[in-house]
């Protein structure tokens, strides 16, 4: 039975979908004004894992992840570059998709862009004004009146007096209260024409928070199962989403029996660098495409999932090397089953049960990966057909996490991308020289080549028929 840690209740809860067998999930996506960094990769990988496990568990999942393609940062970057908003955002949407594909991740079922949902946003703002939860200020902006919603703060667990305006919630002259946040931004004379839309409140553009409320409600309904995102979005973004969505639907007072906007809120932990939160403002961030130049995509996914999704991760090349070494151990064991196949495992299989118990405990991937390493230990001890059976189980369980689906030989030889040192071509040249030395009965030279390769982290494996395989140690 799956349990999910729900940020709203601050506890693990048994997962009960609104419609049996079906799951509707929304994840806050990227603001597309620059290339994606490794923090974005964690969001992508974590919720890719969640969707894969839900589907492996038999659920029909509708996975929506939005694209924010109108935002102050986008506008500023477009002005700085002297290009239209659409040219900038399209370029970085393409780059995001390229990064995601390179990481080996699934595409969301729906990937709405904010600018395609302006009408829905305006409709929701209109309802909030009608419900006396929003007002137009003297500067032309339309703001949400936070103190008029008594239940505001339920996600962050803070009272109104404890809350701060937070990131992206600028306190403007027109606000009645510093906690109020903007729903519709009045157009400024210096802003480009492609950043404004007509509305009942004058030309302008949507605020950041209303975008996700409108898109999620339009695509998933006013009440859905799971909403996810990074921990930094819990407040104010997700808090404001709840306020807007429930305020538009129920007004100031949601009754006890009224369905909440979202049943389960999930938040992944931060990426840290030298024990500091990774962020562009600190200049300590790493682009996905740059990390991919040095590390295999599967290594990056493994690095992310060997830590529980709610815990922070300290990023370093050393940590990625450790992840690479772990994958090498798994693939080396898999290679011992010469014809390992992804098979269907029944729930009665003890390995499958242990793995499922871990994953059903709030997607506990570290514990699930520990099960894989326990199988590796058994593979190393097994003989004959039992090796093959265990290798099949290893591959089948790995598939649930998008691991171990490649040819082991190919993976073990392809880590030149992960390490400095000899290229596969150079290694094959040395192997050919060793074969020639053995044929000439110059065994001292053959042994010297083997030793030299081992010193550079290359392990040779002589096989029947005079063939020689290799892997990185």
From Swiss-Prot:
Motif residue range(s): 'KMSKS' region: 277-281
Gene3D superfamilies named among the record's database cross-references: Cysteine-tRNA ligase, C-terminal anti-codon recognition domain (1.20.120.1910), HUPs (3.40.50.620)
Q: Which GO terms describe its molecular function?
A: ATP binding; cysteine-tRNA ligase activity; zinc ion binding
Might you give the EC number(s) for this enzyme? Answer: 6.1.1.16
Which reaction is the catalytic activity of this chain? tRNA(Cys) + L-cysteine + ATP = L-cysteinyl-tRNA(Cys) + AMP + diphosphate
Matching entries from CDD domains are given as: Anticodon_Ia_Cys, CysRS_core
Q: Which UniProt keywords apply?
A: Aminoacyl-tRNA synthetase, ATP-binding, Cytoplasm, Ligase, Metal-binding, Nucleotide-binding, Protein biosynthesis, Zinc
Name any GO cellular component annotation: cytosol
InterPro entries, per this entry?
Cys-tRNA-ligase, Cys-tRNA-synt_Ia_DALR, Cys-tRNA/MSH_ligase, Rossmann-like_a/b/a_fold, tRNA-synt_1_cat_dom, tRNAsynth_Ia_anticodon-bd
Q: Which PANTHER family match?
A: CYSTEINE--TRNA LIGASE, CYTOPLASMIC, CYSTEINYL-TRNA SYNTHETASE
Q: So what family is this one in?
A: Belongs to the class-I aminoacyl-tRNA synthetase family.
UniProt-recorded name of the protein: Cysteine--tRNA ligase
As recorded in Swiss-Prot or TrEMBL, the protein's gene is named cysS
């Amino acid at each position: 039975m799956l349990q999910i840690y729900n940020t709203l209740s601050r506890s693990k809860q048994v997962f009960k979908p609104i419609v049996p067998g079906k799951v509707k999930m929304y994840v806050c996506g990227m603001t597309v004004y620059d290339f994606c960094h490794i923090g974005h990769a964690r969001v992508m990988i974590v919720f890719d894992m969640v969707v894969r496990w839900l589907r492996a568990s038999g659920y029909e999942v509708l996975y929506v992840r939005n694209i924010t393609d109108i935002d102050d940062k986008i506008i500023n970057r477009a002005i700085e570059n002297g290009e239209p908003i659409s040219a900038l955002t399209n370029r970085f949407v393409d780059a995001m998709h390229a990064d995601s594909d390179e990481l080996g991740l699934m595409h969301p079922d729906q990937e709405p862009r904010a600018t395609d949902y302006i009408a829905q946003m305006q409709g929701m703002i209109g309802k909030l004004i009608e419900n006396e939860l929003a007002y137009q200020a003297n500067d032309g902006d339309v703001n949400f009146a936070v103190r008029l919603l008594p239940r505001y703060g339920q996600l962050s667990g803070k009272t109104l007096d404890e809350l701060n305006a937070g990131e992206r919630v600028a306190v403007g002259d027109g606000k009645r209260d510093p906690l109020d946040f903007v729903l519709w931004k009045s157009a400024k004379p210096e802003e480009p024409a492609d950043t404004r839309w007509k509305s009942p409140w004058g030309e302008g553009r949507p605020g950041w928070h209303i975008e996700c409320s409108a898109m999620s409600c339009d695509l998933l309904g006013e009440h859905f199962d799971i909403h996810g995102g990074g921990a930094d979005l819990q407040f104010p973004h997700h808090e404001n989403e709840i306020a807007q969505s429930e305020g538009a639907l129920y007004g100031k007072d949601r009754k006890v029996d009224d369905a909440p906007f979202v049943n389960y809120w999930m938040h992944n932990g931060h990426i840290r660098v030298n024990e500091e939160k990774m962020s562009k403002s600190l200049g300590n961030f790493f682009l996905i495409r740059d990390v991919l130049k040095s590390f295999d995509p599967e290594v990056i996914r493994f690095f992310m999932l060997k830590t529980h999704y709610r815990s922070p991760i300290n990023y370093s090349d050393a940590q990625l090397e450790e992840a690479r070494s772990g994958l090498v151990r798994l693939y080396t064991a898999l290679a011992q089953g010469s014809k390992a196949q992804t098979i269907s495992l029944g729930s009665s299989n003890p390995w499958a049960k242990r793995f499922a118990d871990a994953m059903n405990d709030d997607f506990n991937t570290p514990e699930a990966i520990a099960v894989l390493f326990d199988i590796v230990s058994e593979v190393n001890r097994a003989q004959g057909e039992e090796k093959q059976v265990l290798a099949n189980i290893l591959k089948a369980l790995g598939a649930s996490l998008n691991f171990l689906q490649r040819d082991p030989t190919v993976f073990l030889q392809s880590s030149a991308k992960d390490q400095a040192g000899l290229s596969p071509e150079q290694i094959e040249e040395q192997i050919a020289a060793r074969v020639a030395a053995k044929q000439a009965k110059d065994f001292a030279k053959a042994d010297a080549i083997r030793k030299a390769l081992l010193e550079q982290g290359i392990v040779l494996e002589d096989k029947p028929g005079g063939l020689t395989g290799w892997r990185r140690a």
